[in-house]
């Protein structure tokens, strides 16, 4: 029995193969319905107020949470091409020193290269040493990060940091 492929059959087979490949490529490159995710903050600041002893250096923690299903690169990612998470604080009337980032968690990509990453997921804390004069002030700054899910990484974002500080 001789089988012949008509143009119609060939087009159907080609479409059956091409559509999943194109869809997979778009998903891995973040091309399908990713625009809303790219504009969204995937990290939130959990610390909103600090009570300190005036004129005494103290270690405090700034708590952040990464949205479930996402991760961000650690402060020291394994690849120099990856965007690190960086906290920049404006000292104002506060004396700030010794930022200490947590170690990243091991994470293996399930798509693409399958490379190992050093990331933050869930809740993480950055420790800082602060000395505040007596009174009320606001600790301000930014957290710069790049959020990724299992299929794509999104443009780097900057999260504003604003924390009320009362020193007595």
How does the language model describe each region?
Residues 16-25:
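Hydrophobic h-region of N-terminal signal peptides that target proteins for export
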Residues 25-168:
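Extracellular/lumen-exposed scaffold segments
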Residues 2-17:
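Bacterial N-terminal signal peptides that target proteins for export
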């Amino acid at each position: 029995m001789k089988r012949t492929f008509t143009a119609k059959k060939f087009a159907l087979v080609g479409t059956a193969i091409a559509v999943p490949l194109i869809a997979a490529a778009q998903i891995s490159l973040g091309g399908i319905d990713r625009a809303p995710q790219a504009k969204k903050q995937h990290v939130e600041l959990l610390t909103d107020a600090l009570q300190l002893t005036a004129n005494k250096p103290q270690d405090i923690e700034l708590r952040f949470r990464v949205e479930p299903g996402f991760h961000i690169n650690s402060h020291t990612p394994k690849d120099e091409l990856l965007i690190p998470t960086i906290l920049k604080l404006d000292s104002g009337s506060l004396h700030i020193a010794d930022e200490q980032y947590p170690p990243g968690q091991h994470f293996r990509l399930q798509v693409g290269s399958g490379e190992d990453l050093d990331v933050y997921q869930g809740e993480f804390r950055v420790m800082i040493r602060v000395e505040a004069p007596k009174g009320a002030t606001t600790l301000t700054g930014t957290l710069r990060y790049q959020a990724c899910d299992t299929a794509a990484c999104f443009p780097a974002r900057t999260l504003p940091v604003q924390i009320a500080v009362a020193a007595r």
